């Protein structure tokens, strides 16, 4: 008898590659519709000419054991004669990776064979199908349940007949839809964006008596290692086997050399149990707790107290860390964002290396998790490789500061006597663990407040006394004051939680700031990033100021990558401090359990003849992430050994495999083959530019005193103390003398504000506020009464606004960027007191008494006067004659993060 099977191809979105197994990409196949008894003879061929398909077509003879199955690769139109010694169900795989085509396979079967009972969800009554299956001599049947297809083996026939197929359909579809949502995948029949899901996908489920372990997720199906389906037919929120194996379809690259195998997918499983279960069931039945939450929390607390490396924790201890990470309101945004970021990386050609996992999570979080990670011994990397294949700084703390992220921390470390059952302070929000992460805003309901003193230790108190400081929970300022005359900060009426302290950083002296507990009260997690933990009961804190003289941007660094180019470590060569510091972010550089030497650094002191070594194997199970610091006196030799090419980058050049010898000189490390004399100036200058670009992308940092601006200032002085190229990014103390704020104020009858144009040239910022005047600026005039026009260096209109005297004005607020040699034309029908210029809050009485006012920006100032003033010495652009009626144009209006100055 003849059978023809026509199957579509599986279209891959741009982030998936042929041969990858994620999200069931190779699970789709179509049944021939028969069960072949053992030793049945048949012929099979594919029709390549008809459809123009170019990839091999695969026919599979499936049953309930991989050892008795067979795969047939069809590569041409020729018939293939087959005889298989085991009972089997033939299927045709959907070819993967081709668009707009089909595959057609012809079967000619000799001898008896059995029709395969097939059920397609919701296309016919379930009982009709079950009756057919019950009466059939076939032990097999095949189910199409939308997002899952199930080949039921003979050993599961009776169970299947007693199973509610609607519940089974809902169970599988709810899991896969939820996992897709956690990844931010979008249904898209064209599959042409980085967020596109796989069209027409479905997981394939079968039994496999020859499979590994208890069950597995594979390239072509997921299966229990049994001749029956077992748990795969049990509908229950506690069915960990099924939700676990389906979760493996979403591992992507997050388990590659991260020691998160069986953890990443479990975090998906835990999330769906979190969704399915009520509060009581969550504590009693969820796999993460199993009615033993206090004991499990105590075990994790012991791991933290004993500084056990996180990489050595067991599966479910690691899983808990992810559960608490995702529990907060916006916690799952972190998961969606990191999956979107993965797809962006994967869609590039060639694919750029993926960031270190903990830094990656930090960069994708809605909140700040650094202190939480640090508490459990996780160290996010400082650097990553961007889309231009360039190593750049994450600036995680600066990013968090710019975005106003709240700092989440376990509640048990904030309210130290908190217990979910015994003393929960009647907190109304849902918490499931004493380790749940909270922010100060969520603890306000406890009514716990106290006065906390921050003791400032500084060599010159005059640098900070009387200077303002403030305390923030995200973007909310919860307290502000000035440093007292005794040099301390007094926080009055502050509630528990982790805040970001915006402390003064000095005046003409710059400092590194280190925040820690008071010596006799060791409860505060010390850090250099101004994360201030206010606990209950309350303790005083110590803020130590250390002179900051040589910029961190003037310190050369090496970047170590693993065999798969995942980030492993940063090596800082600090010539001033005469140290070499290895910041280890990944204890695995290659294959698991492999003890082959991968990297070695040896520092030799030429004066006393001693040496220090730092060694990394492919897998380093006894090591922990963090900092390893070694002395390196001036003229020390430093031998760097790397096993492979293109895996160790020094400054911006990859070192060859083998040994490289460096020397620690007074200002830099030196190797004649790499660094010409004075190269530290060039590399420092390049790092300044990179960090300035970062601030440009996070403009809020221009208004907040921070260490990055200190670093740019000190590095600029090191490179060229006479240059003001980076003045815009200097600390306020050095920038303020060059900061001019110009406010043009249009005034109407009764001195009402009609329109204000404010410009701060050094910050490249402009703001326009329009008042609300229903009768217009001056109802006696039916011609243009006022206008504002800003043009760029090529004459293009950046902003334009005008009103007739009797034309209504409604409230508007615009913010946009302006740069050197931009020009401004203002028109006022009644010159004089109707248009004022206020410079740095002082009225400028020299403004020309003219209807038309012109201005041109320099790097730091605004030159105001007649029309000729807009012609720059180094710019021959002459604008067209002024148009009094400018119209309402708003072209290239740039919205910055926030402009506190306005």
UniProtKB/Swiss-Prot annotation:
It comes from the Viruses. Glycans are attached at residues 73, 265, 278, 339, 540, 593-594, 620, 782, 840. It holds the Pfam family Peptidase_M60. SMART domains: M60-like. Keywords: Glycoprotein, Late protein. PROSITE patterns: PEPTIDASE_M60 (PS51723). Gene3D superfamilies: Peptidase M60, enhancin-like domain 2. Residues 27-330 form the Peptidase M60 domain. The keyword Glycoprotein applies. The keyword Glycoprotein applies. Involved in disruption of the peritrophic membrane and fusion of nucleocapsids with midgut cells. This is Viral-enhancing factor. It comes from Heliothis armigera granulosis virus.
């Amino acid at each position: 008898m003849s059978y023809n099977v026509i199957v579509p191809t599986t279209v891959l979105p741009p982030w998936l590659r042929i041969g990858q197994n994620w999200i069931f990409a190779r699970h789709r196949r179509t049944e021939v519709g028969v069960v072949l008894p053992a030793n049945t003879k048949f012929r099979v061929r594919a029709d390549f000419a008809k459809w123009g398909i170019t990839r091999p077509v695969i026919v599979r003879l499936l049953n309930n054991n991989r050892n008795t199955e067979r795969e047939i690769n069809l590569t041409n139109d020729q018939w293939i004669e087959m005889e298989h010694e085991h009972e089997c169900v033939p299927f045709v795989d959907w070819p993967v990776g081709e668009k707009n085509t089909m595959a057609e396979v012809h079967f000619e079967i000799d001898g008896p064979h059995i029709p395969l009972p097939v059920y397609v969800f919701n296309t016919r009554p379930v009982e009709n199908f079950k009756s057919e299956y019950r009466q059939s001599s076939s032990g097999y049947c095949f189910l199409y349940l939308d997002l899952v297809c199930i080949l039921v083996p003979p050993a599961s026939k009776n169970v299947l007949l007693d199973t509610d197929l609607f519940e089974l359909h809902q169970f599988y579809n709810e899991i896969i839809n939820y996992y897709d949502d956690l990844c931010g995948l979008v249904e898209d029949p064209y599959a042409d964006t980085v967020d596109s899901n796989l069209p027409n996908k479905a997981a394939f489920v079968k039994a496999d008596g020859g499979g590994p372990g208890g069950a597995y997720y594979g390239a072509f199906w997921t299966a229990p290692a049994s001749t029956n389906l077992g748990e795969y037919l049990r509908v229950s929120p506690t069915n960990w086997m099924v939700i676990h194996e389906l979760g493996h379809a979403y591992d992507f690259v997050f388990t590659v050399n991260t020691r998160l195998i069986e953890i990443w997918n479990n975090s998906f499983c835990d999330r769906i149990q979190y969704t399915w279960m009520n509060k009581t069931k969550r504590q009693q039945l969820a796999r993460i707790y199993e009615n033993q939450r206090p004991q499990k929390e105590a075990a994790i607390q012991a791991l933290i107290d004993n500084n056990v490396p996180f990489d050595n924790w067991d599966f479910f201890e690691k899983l808990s860390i992810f559960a608490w990470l995702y529990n907060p309101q916006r916690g799952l945004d972190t998961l969606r964002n990191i999956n979107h970021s993965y797809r962006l990386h994967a869609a590039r050609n060639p694919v750029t290396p993926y960031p270190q996992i903990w830094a990656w999570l930090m960069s994708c979080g809605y909140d700040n998790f650094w202190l939480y990670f640090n508490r459990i011994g996780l160290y996010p990397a400082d650097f990553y490789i961007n889309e231009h294949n360039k190593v750049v700084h994450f600036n995680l703390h600066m990013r968090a500061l710019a975005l106003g992220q709240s700092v989440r921390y376990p509640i048990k470390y904030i309210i130290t006597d908190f217990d979910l059952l015994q003393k929960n302070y009647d907190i109304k929000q849902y918490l499931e663990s004493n380790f749940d992460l909270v922010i100060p805003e969520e603890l306000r309901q406890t009514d716990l407040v106290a006065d906390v003193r921050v003791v400032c230790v500084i060599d010159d108190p005059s640098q900070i006394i009387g200077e303002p400081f403030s305390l923030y929970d995200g973007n909310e300022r919860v307290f502000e004051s000035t440093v007292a005359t005794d040099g301390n900060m007094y926080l009055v009426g502050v509630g528990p939680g982790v805040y970001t302290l915006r402390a003064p950083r000095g005046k003409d002296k710059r400092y590194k700031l280190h925040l820690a507990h008071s010596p006799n009260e060791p409860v505060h997690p010390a850090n250099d990033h101004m994360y201030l933990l206010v606990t209950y009961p309350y303790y005083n804190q110590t803020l130590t100021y250390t002179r900051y003289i040589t910029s961190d941007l003037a310190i050369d660094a090496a970047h170590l990558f693993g065999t798969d180019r995942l980030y492993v470590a940063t090596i800082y060569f600090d010539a001033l401090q005469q140290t070499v510091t290895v910041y280890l972010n990944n204890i695995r550089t290659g294959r698991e359990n492999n003890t082959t030497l991968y990297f070695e650094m040896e520092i030799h002191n030429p004066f006393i003849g001693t040496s220090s070594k730092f060694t990394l194997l492919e897998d380093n199970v006894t090591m922990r992430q963090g900092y390893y610091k070694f002395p390196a006196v001036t003229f020390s030799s430093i031998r760097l050994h790397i096993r492979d090419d293109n895996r160790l980058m020094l400054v911006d050049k990859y070192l060859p495999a083998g040994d490289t010898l460096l020397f620690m000189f007074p200002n830099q490390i030196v190797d004649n083959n790499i660094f010409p004399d004075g190269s530290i100036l060039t590399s420092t200058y390049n790092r300044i530019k990179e960090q300035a670009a970062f601030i440009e992308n996070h403009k809020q940092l221009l208004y907040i005193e921070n260490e990055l601006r200190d670093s740019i200032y000190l590095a600029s002085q090191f490179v060229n103390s006479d240059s003001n190229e980076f003045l815009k990014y200097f600390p306020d103390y050095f920038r303020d003398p060059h900061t001019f704020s110009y406010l043009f104020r249009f005034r109407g009858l009764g001195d009402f504000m009609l329109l204000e144009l404010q410009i701060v040239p050094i910050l490249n910022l402009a703001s326009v506020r329009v008042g609300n005047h229903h009768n217009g600026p001056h109802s006696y005039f039916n011609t243009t009464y006022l206008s504002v026009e800003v043009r760029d260096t090529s004459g293009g209109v950046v902003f334009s606004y005008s009103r007739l005297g009797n034309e209504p004005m409604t409230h508007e607020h615009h913010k946009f960027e302006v740069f050197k040699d931009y020009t401004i034309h203002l028109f006022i029908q009644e010159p004089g007191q109707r248009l004022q210029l206020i410079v740095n809050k002082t009225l400028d009485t020299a403004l020309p008494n003219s209807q038309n006012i012109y201005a041109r920006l320099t790097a730091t100032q605004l030159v105001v006067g007649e029309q000729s003033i807009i012609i720059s010495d180094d710019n021959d652009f002459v604008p067209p004659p002024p148009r009094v009626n400018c119209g309402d144009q708003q072209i290239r209006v740039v919205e910055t993060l926030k402009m506190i100055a306005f």
